[in-house]
Amino acid sequence: TVQTLKRLRLEIPCLSSGCCLKFKNEYENVIFEITQYAILAQKLDTPYIRVLADLEPQPDGEVDDKYLSELLKELAVIAEKYNVTLLVETNGVYSDTKRLKALLDDVANSHVAALWDIHHPYRYANETPEQTINNLGDYIKYVHVKDSIIINGQVDYRLMGEGDLPVKDILSCLQKNNYNGYISLEWVKRWADHLSDAGIVF
């Protein structure tokens, strides 16, 4: 598979781990899973691994920032060993990107940065694109895009351009911040059955 990817000149820029870091009783599983992801990422020449510090897209319950900081410092040692960077997604309580910045500042390791899911800070923390960029700045190494509207107080995911996220403003802010990384359409049909099939979207 690795040789096929190289022959086709295809790159896998980011692996998405499924573990959630906030659960203290999952500590050993998190260490094991991230280690396995880091080994695979090195084999694939994949620079990034997405990690979830909180579980849900929206804030739901509290998270122990101090515990997460210490855990990320441990995980950073693993990431550095395999020359990959862990990207904490802007979801859950970390939709508040000031809080995420404070966490990343405390970790203070170049092998831990941010994945900006454009949806969650805008939708759940009422942040403008400018605020998110000002908060995270060069911590942003990878971007997930999706679109939605609110119906009866609930998020309803839509095709890009059919929601009300300020996508053009977001892309403009990234450009002004000299972002030159990947922008990935995250199609959440797994959690929103009404969405069109990926074949239609792509």
Which role fits each region the language model picked out?
Residues 4-14, 21-114, 123:
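Active-site acidic/histidine proton-transfer and metal-coordination neighborhood
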Residues 17, 90-91, 146, 186:
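Active-site-proximal beta-strand/loop segments in catalytic clefts of secreted hydrolases
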Residues 18-21, 149:
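Active-site/binding-pocket entry motifs
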